[in-house]
Structures are given as C-alpha cells and as structure tokens.
From Swiss-Prot:
Subunit (UniProt): Monomer.
CC cofactor note: Binds 1 dipyrromethane group covalently.
Protein name, entry field: Porphobilinogen deaminase
GO annotations of cellular component type: cytoplasm
Length: 295
C-alpha cells in the first residue's frame, strides 16, 4: 500500500515528518510512504502574534482539507499547535513517545534567566510563556515574535530587534539537532508547558482504520495517557487561543497520573494554577477544569 504524508514545509515540520515516515517504513516494509508539502495560512501570516490571530487552526486548515478530500492519507503536526477539537471526519492516532516537553531560553549574553538585567527584552509569541515569566520577573519586558526556529534565533542575534533572549520549545530544538544553543531549561512545574507540548500529532481520516491501526501499534502508552489528559483540559478551557493555558502531566511510578495546570485571563492579571491526580486520563482533565470552575 502507498501512503501520502502531508506536512508543512518548514525545516522542523519536515524533520518531524521524515521521522514518522522512517518509522513507518521500518515497521511496515511492505508499504511505501511519501511526503506531500502543503503551505498553510500560518506559513503565510508571520507578522502577527498567535493570540492576535485567534485560532490554532491556521497552521493546519489546508492540511486537514487535503485529508478530507483524500489527496493525502495522514498528516504530521506538532500537537501543541493543534485545535482542541479534531475536525469532523478526522482523528488523531495515539501518541508516540513524547519529546522533552519543557520550554527553554536562548539568551544573547546572560548566563541564565535570573541574571538578565532589569528591563531586558524577551521575544515570544506565546501569551502563556510571557505571563508565567512575567510573574517570575516583573521587571522584564516581552515582545511578540513569530517565525520558525531559524528566524527567531536570527532575530535574537540581530541587534536591530533589541532582544536579549527568546523562548522556544525544547522538543523542536532537539529534533533539529540544535539543543547545544539552549541557555536554560525552564522547570515545567514553574513554567507550565503548552498542553501536549513535545507530542507529535499524527492525523488521519476516521474511516481509514487500517492505517490508524498501523500508526497506533507504534504508540507509547504513558505519552498517550498524558497527552489525552492535557488535551482534555485544553478542550474544556475553550482552546487556549485568547488566554494562557498550560498543562503538564506525568505518569507516577505506580501508574497514576499527576497533572499541574494553568489558566488565566487575556491580560495575565489573573492566573490560576492547580494540581490533580487520578488514574483515568479524561477524568484527570475534567477534574482540573472542574476545580478551576470551567465546567
């Protein structure tokens, strides 16, 4: 059987899709796989912060349309960029082994976040990241920055942008082989990551059960349970487009789930954080939302 894998054309998207292609080829040598590059609205609109655009779907709309039309068979995304609800007729496969979920800092000269001088400027397009870092250092300024990893690092090094540092996801830098450029890893209990950060989203049509079964056979149980808990919470918050939403779930030694979550308003004047534990992924997500008064 021949399968077409849809992907964005950025360097990171291609690295992730090549990884999925390689694993599928190794597991199913009787099948063939090819990458199909699709340009999305998010690739074209690069001058606005994510919160101002108002939807995560702008990274995936054209790819999901290709899935629904049958011009591709599966698609690979970063799960943290996906809308809280899957498009009608589509579904996500179970999560494969998760990459590092942490946020990281790349600083121009300072050796750590605590060493940044008062008034330093940090670039991030994420309200979640800016809100949490501002709570730790209210004397630091934040400015919106968009673009792929190369673009953001180039802006940091270009003095005309006036940046002292940028915030990125460890997973992307690791996948690109650029982890040596990280200045500091941020504790996920302090700066809570985006829901399902570090997880690859592999999406198919619901009716394509044979392909879905093949993808699911390569899944990682702990990563999948954690991702389901985090994304259940994300869905119950309304999707995380206009408000800071974070979730970090880990599997304890006894198999129970422990999740810390964050939810705030759009100006970061009210930030709530709570911790929940449980055994069922969806129930943990629902309990977190209930404790915050979201359901």
């Amino acid at each position: 059987m021949h399968y077409r894998i849809g992907t964005r054309g950025s360097k990171l998207a291609l690295v992730q899709s090549e990884y999925v292609k390689r694993r599928m080829e190794e597991a199913y040598p009787e099948d063939t796989f090819e990458l199909v590059i699709i340009k999305t609205t998010g690739d074209k609109v690069t001058d606005k912060p994510l919160a101002a655009i108002g939807t995560k779907g702008f990274f995936v709309k054209e790819i999901e349309e290709a899935l629904l039309s049958g011009s591709i068979d599966m698609a690979v995304h970063s799960m943290k960029d996906m809308p809280a609800e899957c498009a009608a007729g589509l579904t996500f496969a179970k999560a494969w082994k998760r990459e590092d979920c942490r946020d990281v800092l790349i600083l121009k000269t300072a050796g750590s976040f605590s060493e940044l001088p008062s008034g330093a400027v940090i670039g991030t397009g994420s309200l979640r990241r800016a809100c949490q870092l501002a709570m730790l250092r209210p004397d630091i300024q934040f400015t919106a920055i968009r673009g792929n990893v190369d673009t953001r690092i180039n802006k940091l090094m270009d003095d005309s942008y006036g940046l002292d540092g940028i915030v990125l996801a460890a997973a992307g830098l690791n996948r690109l082989g650029r982890s040596s450029e990280i200045t500091e890893y941020l504790d996920p209990e302090v700066v809570i990551p985006a829901p399902a950060q570090g997880v690859l989203a592999i999406e198919t049509a619901e009716v394509n059960t044979e392909l879905l079964d093949k993808i699911n056979a390569l899944s990682d149980d702990n990563s999948d349970r954690e991702a389901v808990a985090e994304r259940t919470f994300l869905r119950l918050t309304g999707g995380g487009c206009h408000a800071p939403v974070g979730a970090h779930c880990v599997t304890k030694d006894n198999g129970d789930l422990r999740m810390v979550v964050l939810f705030g308003n759009d100006d970061c004047s009210r930030i709530l954080r709570i911790e929940v534990t449980g055994t069922d992924s969806e129930a943990v997500g629902h309990e977190a939302a209930r404790m915050l008064g979201l359901e």
